[in-house]
């Protein structure tokens, strides 16, 4: 039965660390022993390179997470293939009452960046297809659907880009929204201005916020006058 506090349980954390030129300089990988969902779903079994016997040898999530964050270091930014990884990670963190991540959490959605740069229609594709399109070698001992291997290939996709390509393409995970005015985010991108506001108790409170209801045009810097129904 699904637990509403943690619908998806993380069973593996894998990552690669990149330098400023997107060279892989370190890796992290650890299997997690599940607490809630100890039996793998059939469709999950078909794509993983291990089974329940491997999971039983894993370590608790909170132990692995603390080790992983320590490995990340002080100055880092996440890059993920898709937008859901950080959301699921934070759901698991909440279940174990771990200290929340910074709010809002800045990261690079490499899947979306790839789509914007390499697909005329901006179509989202799976990691394997992107790797094939970029003619990145798939190593025999690094099959897909392993957290650390998928991170490895995501890193190689980034390697085909330059830091300048990513300068304006960051986004924010808003699993935890800003709670106060001082924590709000106003970020200037090349083609738009992003404003992540604090939470409001009701619609009337939001409407009464002049800065929220009259956003700034990213081109001219003037405030707009939107209509609210």
Describe each PLM feature range.
Residues 67-70, 87, 91, 129, ...:
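Residue-level signal for well-ordered alpha-helical scaffold segments within enzymatic catalytic domains
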Residues 92, 147, 151-161, 165:
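AAA+ P-loop ATPase catalytic core
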Residues 45, 52-55, 113-151:
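Active-site-proximal helix-loop-helix substrate-binding element of RNase H-like nuclease domains
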Residues 157-229:
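Acidic two-metal-ion nuclease catalytic site recognized across multiple nuclease folds
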Residues 91-97:
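A short secondary-structure junction motif
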Residues 1-90:
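Conserved non-catalytic scaffold segment of RNase H-like nuclease domains
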Residues 101-114:
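Conserved beta-strand -> loop -> alpha-helix junction used to position metal-binding or nucleic-acid-contacting
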């Amino acid at each position: 039965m699904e637990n509403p506090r943690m619908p998806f349980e993380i069973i593996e954390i894998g990552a690669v660390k990149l330098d400023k030129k997107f060279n892989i300089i370190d890796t992290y990988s650890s299997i997690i022993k599940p607490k809630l969902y100890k039996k793998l779903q059939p469709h999950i079994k078909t794509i993983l390179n291990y089974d329940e016997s491997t999971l039983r040898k894993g370590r608790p999530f909170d132990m692995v997470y603390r080790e992983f964050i320590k490995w990340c270091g002080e100055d880092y930014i996440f890059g993920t293939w898709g937008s859901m990884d950080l959301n699921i990670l934070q759901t698991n963190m909440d279940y174990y009452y771990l200290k929340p991540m910074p709010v809002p959490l800045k990261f690079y959605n490499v899947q979306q960046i790839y789509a914007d740069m390499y697909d005329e229609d901006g179509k989202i594709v799976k990691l394997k297809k992107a790797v094939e399109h970029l003619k990145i070698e798939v190593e025999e001992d690094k099959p897909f659907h392993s957290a650390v291997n998928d991170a490895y290939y995501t890193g190689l996709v980034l390697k085909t880009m330059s830091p300048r390509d990513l300068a304006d393409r960051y986004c924010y995970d808003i699993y935890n929204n800003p709670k106060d005015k001082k924590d709000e985010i106003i970020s200037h991108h090349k083609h738009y201005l992003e404003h992540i506001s604090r939470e409001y108790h009701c619609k009337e409170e939001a409407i009464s916020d002049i800065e929220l209801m009259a956003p700034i045009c990213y081109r001219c810097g003037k405030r707009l006058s939107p209509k609210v129904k």
